[in-house]
Amino acid sequence: MQRLILIETSTALCSAAIAEGGVITSYRESSAPKAHASLTAVFIQEMLQERGISLSDCDAVCVSMGPGSYTGLRVGVSTAKGLCFGAGKPLIAVGTLDTLVAQAQMADQVGHDGSTNTVIPDQNTVIPDLIGDPRFIIPMIDARRMEVYSAVFEIAGQAGNDARQITETAPAIIDENSFAEYLEQGPCLFIGDGAGKCADVIRHPNAHFCQCWPKASAMLSPAIKALNEKRFEDVAYFEPFYLKEFVATVSKKKMW
């Protein structure tokens, strides 16, 4: 039986999961301040105890590679590397945008928040029933102001469960003309913690928005694929995909 540890720390939500036999069997999450540094390792320890297994029983550790929060990604990758080093397990990295696409394809339950074509997570309506089959899924990670990290994925396959990335992952400043060429072709689902702020700017009948955080549970499908294909990272040299170079600034506040 395949067992995976999944770690997602790229946004304000810190989440971790254990998968066994292709099913999520344990899950933890927190959006509390500084949860990434204080809870990631705790979550993993709790879940291993809950399942009655040890790290040596797991086949690999999977972590979000970004883009996303510099601090969050650093904590997640450091934790994953530590687990892999300690137990001699392979490291799998899954892109944050790929996780959001998988999350959309899981048909997570969402409902209206009262504004046109905008949805937020709850227990009422399934995404495909709400918007029909989307032609494109456009995951968005918030990058402050009106900027997001994003890419466009085209949906293919008879069941609509095959997504192909057709643009490079890149930062984008959102305005009323953003993604116009894709909106003219069919329904587009904008999903992620950067999607909600775009709803007031991108006005189009084919534009649908789901404001949510990427979750460790949604990493399972791409993680299993990477495990089966033996697409592992070099534990010693792997670094997160920050996309933007992190720049440390000196506070202008007087220290004394």
Where are these regions (language model features)?
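N-terminal beta-alpha supersecondary unit
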Residues: M1-M65
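Conserved hydrophobic/aromatic positions in well-ordered beta-strands
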Residues: A17, Y149-F153, F241
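Surface "functional belts" at beta-alpha junctions
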Residues: V23, P90-P214, V247-A248
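Residues at secondary-structure transition points
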Residues: S31-L39, Y70, R74, S78, ...
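Stable alpha-helical structural segments in soluble proteins, enriched in small hydrophobic residues
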Residues: M47-R51, G86, A104, A216-L227
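DPxDG-like acidic metal-binding loop motif
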Residues: V63-T96
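Acyltransferase
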Residues: F209-W256
